[in-house]
A protein has these predicted regions:
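Active-site phosphate/pyrophosphate-handling residues
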Residues: 4-7, 38, 63, 126
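Charged, amphipathic alpha-helical coiled-coil/dimerization segments
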Residues: 70-133, 140
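Flexible interhelical turns and helix-capping residues at alpha-helix boundaries
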Residues: 13, 32, 47, 58, ...
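Generic C-terminal helix-cap and adjacent flexible tail
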Residues: 137-148
Length: 148
């Protein structure tokens, strides 16, 4: 029997992205893509960070992150600036407008979390998170070692 886990992971990801788009819209954040929502949530956790750190926190590649940040700057949600100590490093921080959407982002992601874990026990959720974290580590390690 063929392992269908990759198909299932991909399906959950794509449906989750569509649901998140709808939830962001419902909470007044219709201009944001799911990736931009992830960027905001990461910056709510740790503001004024390097683009490299933000890429690590969101698992977005640098080109996707750069395009998303450009759009978010146009929306007035974030601003980029050079690092005072190392001019090669670009930093990102929330604007007042970006900070004002914190509650709406939290509510949208909480709704999505509730949908995802509906019918899943806390024990199952814990096991799932441990396995998912291991899968993440496995693919991250392979990506760092640059499979060609």
């Amino acid at each position: 029997m063929q392992d269908k886990s990759l198909f299932a992971l991909s399906g959950v990801y794509h449906i989750k992205e569509r649901l998140l788009t709808r939830l962001l819209r419902r909470h007044g954040l219709g201009r944001l893509s799911p990736a931009q929502g992830r960027i905001l949530m990461a910056l709510y956790e740790q503001d004024d960070i390097s683009v490299r750190k933000l890429s690590e926190m969101t698992s977005l590649d640098k080109s996707t992150l750069s395009l998303s940040l450009t759009r978010m700057e146009q929306f007035g949600l974030v601003e980029r600036s050079g690092d005072e100590k190392d001019r090669r490093v670009m930093r990102v921080k929330l604007t007042r407008s970006g900070r004002s959407h914190r509650q709406a982002c939290h509510e949208a992601t909480q709704e999505l979390t509730d949908i995802l874990y509906c019918g899943v026990t806390n024990e199952e959720r814990g096991v799932f998170l441990r396995v998912l974290n291991q899968l993440f580590e496995n693919v991250s390690e392979q990506e760092r070692s640059a499979i060609d």
